[in-house]
From Swiss-Prot:
<keyword id="KW-1003">Cell membrane</keyword>
<keyword id="KW-0716">Sensory transduction</keyword>
<feature type="topological domain" description="Extracellular">
    <location>
        <begin position="164"/>
        <end position="199"/>
    </location>
</feature>
<feature type="disulfide bond">
    <location>
        <begin position="100"/>
        <end position="192"/>
    </location>
</feature>
<feature type="transmembrane region" description="Helical; Name=3">
    <location>
        <begin position="103"/>
        <end position="123"/>
    </location>
</feature>
<feature type="transmembrane region" description="Helical; Name=1">
    <location>
        <begin position="29"/>
        <end position="49"/>
    </location>
</feature>
<dbReference type="InterPro" id="IPR017452">
    <property type="entry name" value="GPCR_Rhodpsn_7TM"/>
</dbReference>
<feature type="topological domain" description="Extracellular">
    <location>
        <begin position="79"/>
        <end position="102"/>
    </location>
</feature>
<feature type="topological domain" description="Cytoplasmic">
    <location>
        <begin position="221"/>
        <end position="240"/>
    </location>
</feature>
<feature type="topological domain" description="Extracellular">
    <location>
        <begin position="262"/>
        <end position="276"/>
    </location>
</feature>
<comment type="similarity">
    <text>Belongs to the G-protein coupled receptor 1 family.</text>
</comment>
<feature type="topological domain" description="Cytoplasmic">
    <location>
        <begin position="50"/>
        <end position="57"/>
    </location>
</feature>
<feature type="topological domain" description="Extracellular">
    <location>
        <begin position="1"/>
        <end position="28"/>
    </location>
</feature>
<keyword id="KW-0472">Membrane</keyword>
<keyword id="KW-0807">Transducer</keyword>
<keyword id="KW-1133">Transmembrane helix</keyword>
<dbReference type="GO" id="GO:0004984">
    <property type="term" value="F:olfactory receptor activity"/>
</dbReference>
Length: 313
């Protein structure tokens, strides 16, 4: 492992990631549940992707959106968790300057895209439940294609400046990052330049994007709840509430943790440093591990598709 750099004049060529500065001895114990969650997330999302790709009956707009969500989850897990486990298991804390900013870009980009995908999926469920007769004419393959373009375009416009703003800074306050990942504010705090604009941009962009997505999701599920409560069939209300409720709780966890991370990164001196670090790791593991179960395995068509796939093997 490379030694920390304290030379304020030498250009930084790599950073050292210090996970849980106050609980270093706990890292080996923490690695086991993280490894299990990582394997669950990768296995479940890969299975869902393959099933939707190979099962012709699942070639529908909703399942295309599920495929996009699974792909985003896989990339997010692979971007963050292997490096975290390498730190825990082998003490491989160094990360090169380009690799750090590449990780930062992918994390910001794919988290932004995932938030937008949740919003599009909430709209899909709103149309399916509140306007079922119009669903085939509104939620089409063309709609999904336009939604994907919107997700990517919005991400490029908003997320790309984050690593660019950090990469342009001069780093002269050492190379030790008190985090397990290269988050924007954790890295920029090592700069000897003024980072006020970086902090302001992340705060405004984070609250604007995630807040607007969450508001639209809440509105969609509010209309869904209103329609569901009118259902007279026995057991139908409980089933619908169970399905939509689990969707909404998972989305709420995803969005709330992101917004909390924006706040804790800006108020780091008032909050124990290990709290946002743990939240960051769990945020890259729990939603990817649960998304395929909540959105996929609990769906009758997905379960049937997996069974058909297993029969072919």
């Amino acid at each position: 492992m490379a030694s920390p750099s304290n030379d304020s004049t030498a250009p930084v060529s790599e950073f050292l990631l210090i996970c849980f500065p106050n609980f270093q001895s706990w890292q080996h114990w923490l690695s086991l549940p993280l490894s299990l969650l990582f394997l669950l997330a990768m296995g479940a999302n890969t299975t869902l992707l393959i099933t939707i790709q190979l099962e012709a009956s699942l070639h529908q707009p909703l399942y295309y959106l599920l495929s996009l969500l699974s792909l985003l989850d896989i990339v997010l897990c692979l971007t963050v968790i292997p490096k975290v486990l390498a730190i825990f298991w082998f003490d491989l804390r160094s990360i090169s300057f380009p690799a750090c900013f590449l990780q930062m870009f992918i994390m910001n980009s794919f988290l932004t895209m995932e938030s937008c995908t949740f919003m599009v999926m909430a709209y899909d469920r709103y149309v399916a439940i509140c306007h079922p007769l119009r669903y085939p004419s509104i939620i089409t393959d063309q709609f999904v294609a336009r939604a994907v373009v919107f997700v990517i375009a919005r991400n490029a416009f908003v997320s790309l400046p984050v690593p660019m703003l950090s990469a342009r800074l001069r780093y002269c306050a050492g190379n030790i990052i008190k985090n397990c990942i290269c988050s924007n504010l954790s890295v920029s705090k090592l700069s000897c330049d003024d980072i006020t604009f970086n902090q302001l941009y992340q705060f405004v962009a984070g609250w604007t994007l995630l807040g607007s997505d969450l508001i639209l999701i809440v509105i969609s599920y509010s209309f869904i709840l209103k329609v569901v409560l009118r259902i007279k069939a026995e057991g139908a209300v409980a089933k619908a509430l169970s399905t939509c409720g689990s969707h909404f709780i998972l989305i709420l966890f995803f969005s709330t943790v992101l917004l909390v991370l924006v706040i804790t990164n800006l108020a780091r001196k008032r909050i124990p440093p290990d709290v946002p670090i743990l939240l960051n790791i769990l945020h890259h593991l729990i939603p990817p591990a649960l998304n395929p179960i909540v959105y996929g395995v609990r769906t009758k068509e997905i379960k049937q598709g997996i069974q058909n796939l297993l029969k072919r093997l």
